[in-house]
Amino acid sequence: MSDVENQPFFNIQRIYLKDLSLEQPNSPAIFLEQEMPAVEVEVDVKAERLAENVYEIVVAGTVTAKVREKVAFLVEAKQAGIFDIRNIPAEQIDPLCGIACPTILFPYLRSNIADSITRAGFPPIHLAEINFQALYEQRLAEISQQQQQGGAPNGTTLN
């Protein structure tokens, strides 16, 4: 093989909105509320090997806004990407899929969530940046702790 064929290769094949759901269980009455909603945000990352050197990474986000325990809206979205990753050492694949790829996908997720909230008639909510390296390290610590306790880790790992 030539040196070019052995060079590390990282390519985004496709970025797409895999799933989007918006619920407004208390509309239209919730629009009459004057109080600002309390907003909860959850983010998760999943990775799946589709083929040799091809991975699907999904960043899932859930935004729930409540006014006095009444749900104003609930948005669930999954932003996905298909990445071609070749000639990368095996021990670097998992961090690449857990840190670099989600960092690429998150701005798309944030935009889609903000757009759907605005289109639903609510003031925009802009999600803060996420440190995916810290999130990845936290997940590794949780997996290590679960393994020490004899439990199976949650989520998807790449092998």
Swiss-Prot record:
Q: Does the record carry Methyltransferase as a key word?
A: no
User: Subcellular localization, per the record?
Assistant: Cytoplasm
Q: Which InterPro entries match?
A: SecB (IPR003708), SecB-like_sf (IPR035958)
Does the keyword Protein transport belong to this entry?
A: yes
The Gene Ontology terms for molecular function here are: unfolded protein binding
Going by the UniProt record, its keywords in alphabetical order are:
Chaperone, Cytoplasm, Protein transport, Translocation, Transport
Q: Which domain of life is it from?
A: Bacteria
Q: Name one Pfam family in it.
A: SecB
The processes (GO biological process) annotated in the record are: protein folding; protein tetramerization; protein transport
Of the GO CC terms on this record, one is: cytoplasm
Task: Describe the protein's quaternary organization and the partners it interacts with.
Answer: Homotetramer, a dimer of dimers. One homotetramer interacts with 1 SecA dimer.
Q: Which family does it belong to?
A: Belongs to the SecB family.
Q: Which NCBIfam families match?
A: PRK05751.1-3, PRK05751.1-5, secB
Q: What does this protein do?
A: One of the proteins required for the normal export of preproteins out of the cell cytoplasm. It is a molecular chaperone that binds to a subset of precursor proteins, maintaining them in a translocation-competent state. It also specifically binds to its receptor SecA.
Recorded protein name is: Protein-export protein SecB
- Organism of origin is Burkholderia mallei (strain ATCC 23344)
The protein's gene is named secB
